[in-house]
Amino acid sequence: MSEIKRLEINYKTDELFENFRAFGNKDLYMVNELNGQMIDASSDSPFYGIFVGDQLGARMALLKKGDVEEIYFPDFEDYILLWKLEVLPKYQNRGYASELIDFAKSFNMPIKAIGRNDSKDFFLHHGFTDVEAKNIEGHDVLLWKPIR
């Protein structure tokens, strides 16, 4: 199992994200999330990643309900939004995305995910359910609920 590290919000993190911008889908770019927040490293950073050597190979953001949206699931007091899960092509098929999902599940809170870029089946494979709704961009909304 890989070590999942919280990524600080600073210029170094922006440089690490550059590799993802070089190949990725523009919907997954995190540059806007970093703009204006790079004065000091933040202990409240929502960004997590897996390093392969000194290169960031996989990343995601875990946001709290209300950080980027209004309450979406009225059935839950609180939940996590798993946002922009991405693995660089040369590191795909090594289980890194699954490890990030398992890390998010370890908080034992409901998780909302958006099925972008053909990821819906991946989330379904990991126990998420399709809530039969679309976000404002037309992507599928999925939910994982912990067993209580």
UniProtKB/Swiss-Prot annotation:
- N-acetyltransferase domain location is 7-148
Documented EC number(s): 2.3.1.-
GO terms (molecular function) for this protein are: acyltransferase activity, transferring groups other than amino-acyl groups
**Keywords annotated in UniProt:** Acyltransferase, Transferase
The top EC class is transferase
Q: Sorted alphabetically, which NCBIfam families does this protein's record hold? A: PRK13688.1
**HAMAP family per the UniProt record, alphabetical:** Acetyltransf_YlbP
Name of this protein: Uncharacterized N-acetyltransferase SAV1176
Q: Can you name the source organism?
A: Staphylococcus aureus (strain Mu50 / ATCC 700699)
